[in-house]
């Protein structure tokens, strides 16, 4: 007589993992590193100024009159806070049943929504050319993005290569900025790795080190400015930002808040909402390269750290 096998059994208890795998990226480098400051209006403003050019003819006769000079006012910049939200709508039945990997479906969905909101925030701030808009009764307010607040003279549309990168870091140095970071889309990582090479030959081989390292963590430009290289998934593929985090800020009119909305039948609806905006203290304190890296392009830098 044949042995009784599982193939003919009834009532076998299913084996279901009590967790949920989700590898969707959550890290938001930009908003994690910049300062948050409160605002009390939907429009917020700030000022910037500049010193006059150096006057190498600043020489005067003894006992001469001090003549009047024309003074220039500060420049006022404005931006707006933008309402961002996520809505979760879960039936009472879905919230009551026992589920693998979470205790209550509502709490699980709210946790996901909070992470998604943070990613939306990062992506909006990093847009290249999204202008601010005061909005109206029928149109939402828009916060101007990082790229749109950078002065036109500090932007360049070109392939991402060594010459362009160092041209922009030199511009920042000349203007008096103090850049410490380069933020780029991961698709351009090979450009930064290429800076370790010269004429197709790898420059650094460490004895007894079995690792093959392509990553470049820091770049020192010809003027001695040391910049940390940070990939950011939420950067546009053709945008590379050069800046100092201390020159950026996130205006907060309303911090993220979970709000229970009116119950609809046998379902619960919650909203997570915030009202925030972006600030760049000075339009010449950051630079933007609009373009992608082309394999085989102009790499070959020497001043790198990994």
Curated annotation (Swiss-Prot):
Subcellular location: Virion
UniProt key word Translocase: no
GO CC entries: T=7 icosahedral viral capsid
InterPro entries named among the record's database cross-references: SU10_MCP
Transmembrane segments: none
Domain of life: Viruses
Keywords (A to Z) from UniProt: Capsid protein, T=7 icosahedral capsid protein, Virion
Name of protein: Major capsid protein
Species for this entry: Serratia phage KSP100 (Serratia marcescens bacteriophage KSP100)
Organism lineage: Viruses, Duplodnaviria, Heunggongvirae, Uroviricota, Caudoviricetes
């Amino acid at each position: 007589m044949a042995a009784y096998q599982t193939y003919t059994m009834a009532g076998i208890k299913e084996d279901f993992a009590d967790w949920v795998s989700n590898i969707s990226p959550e890290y938001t480098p930009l908003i994690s590193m910049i300062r948050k400051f409160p605002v009390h209006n939907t429009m917020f403003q700030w000022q910037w100024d500049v010193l006059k050019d150096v006057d190498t003819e600043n020489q005067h006769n003894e006992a001469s009159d001090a003549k009047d000079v024309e003074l220039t006012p500060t420049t006022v910049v404005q931006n707006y806070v933008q309402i961002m939200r996520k809505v979760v709508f879960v039936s009472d039945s879905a919230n009551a049943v026992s589920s693998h990997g979470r205790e209550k479906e509502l709490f699980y969905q709210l946790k996901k929504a909070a992470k998604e909101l943070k990613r939306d925030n990062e992506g909006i701030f990093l847009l290249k050319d999204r202008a601010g808009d005061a909005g109206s009764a029928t149109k939402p307010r828009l916060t101007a993005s990082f790229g749109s607040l950078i002065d036109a003279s500090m932007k360049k549309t070109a392939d991402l290569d060594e010459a362009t990168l160092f041209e922009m870091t030199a511009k920042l140095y000349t203007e008096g900025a103090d850049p410490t970071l380069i933020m780029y889309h991961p698709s351009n990582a090979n450009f930064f790795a290429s800076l370790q090479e010269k004429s197709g030959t790898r420059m650094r081989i460490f004895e007894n080190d079995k690792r093959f390292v392509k990553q470049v963590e820091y770049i020192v430009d010809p003027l001695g400015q040391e910049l940390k290289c940070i990939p950011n998934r939420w950067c546009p593929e053709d945008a590379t930002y050069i800046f100092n985090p201390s020159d950026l800020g996130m205006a907060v009119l309303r911090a993220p808040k979970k709000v229970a909305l009116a119950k609809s039948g046998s379902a619960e609806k919650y909203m997570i909402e915030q009202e925030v905006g972006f600030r760049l203290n000075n339009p010449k304190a950051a630079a933007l390269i609009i373009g992608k890296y082309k394999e085989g392009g102009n790499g070959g830098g020497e001043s790198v750290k990994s």
